[in-house]
C-alpha cells in the first residue's frame, strides 16, 4: 500500500474515533444542523475504517506467518497462511481504493432535467419529445417520481423546451452524465423525399439545491412576471394569471413555471429551478477551470459538447465520450439506458482511480 493512501486511512481512523466521541456527548444535539453534518460524515467514513481494520488484521496475520516460517516444521503451514493473508490484503486494498474515491456531494440529490430543442426546427422539437419520453420511462423503471415543471409545446406535438423534476434515490448519480448536446439522424415526419436530416437538442441535468447550502438570492435582483398559462394551440387556457416567469437580472437567467393552477406553487417551483440553475452554472465554471489542468472524458457538463448521436436508420446510439455504440435504439428510446449509464459511471470511476494512483 502506498504511504499516501496509508496516511489517509490512518487519518480517517482517528477522525472516526473523534466523531464517536462528539456524537455521544451531551452537547451533540443542541445544534441539529451540526449534528446532521456529523452523522453524515460518520456514515461516510465508518465503512472505510471497518475495511481498513480488516486490512490491518490481514497484515498482522501475514507478519505472524513470516515469524512462523523461522520454525522449519511450520514452514509449509506458514507459507499457506502468508499466501492467504497477502491475497486478502490485495483484495481489501482494491476495495479501499474505491472507497477513498472523492464523493460527489450531489449524487443523492433530486434533479431538474431540462431538454431544449436546438438546430432543426420542428424535427428538433419532436426529438425533444422523444428524449422526454426516454427519460420519463427510465425514471419510472427506477421508481422515481416525475413532475413536469414547465413545458413549451411546438405546433407538431414536440417541445421547444421542457423541464422535469425527478425525485428518488440517487437520481443525480444516475443522470449526471446526460448533460450536453444530443444529435439525431433520421427521416423526419415532414420529409417527403425520404432524406435523412440531422438535428439536435441540449440536455441539462441540475441537482436540486439543498436548502441549507442554497445560494442566497437578493429579492431586489429578481423580476417576477405573471401571465396566463396555456398549452399548444391555446388549449387549457387559465382564466387567472397563474403562470410565473422569474428573471435573475445579474445573470440573465430566466425560469418559467405554469404547470400548477396555483400561482404560489408555480412561483415556489420556479424559485427552486432558478437556484439550481445558478448553482449549476457556478459548478460548471469550476469544472471548466479544473479541466484546464486535467482533461476528463466525462462530466465536464459543457452544454455545447456533442455527447451522443441517435442514428435511427442504423438503429444505433453512439456516446462519443467513451466511443460506445449500442444497437438497440428502440429499447433505449423506451427508457432502457442502464447499459449506457453504467458504462459512463465505470469510465468515470476508472478516471478517478487513475488520478488517485497519481497522487
Curated annotation (Swiss-Prot):
Molecular functions per Gene Ontology: translation release factor activity, codon specific
Pfam families in the cross-refs: PCRF (PF03462), RF-1 (PF00472)
Domain of life: Bacteria
Protein biosynthesis in keyword set: yes
Keywords (A to Z) from UniProt: Cytoplasm, Methylation, Protein biosynthesis
Subcellular location: Cytoplasm
PTM section of the record: Methylated by PrmC. Methylation increases the termination efficiency of RF1.
Assigned GO CC terms: cytoplasm
Residue list for modification N5-methylglutamine: 235
PANTHER family the record matches: LD18447P
Alphabetical list of NCBIfam families matching this protein: prfA (TIGR00019), PRK00591.1 (NF001859)
Family per similarity comment: Belongs to the prokaryotic/mitochondrial release factor family.
Function noted in UniProt: Peptide chain release factor 1 directs the termination of translation in response to the peptide chain termination codons UAG and UAA.
Official protein name in the record: Peptide chain release factor 1
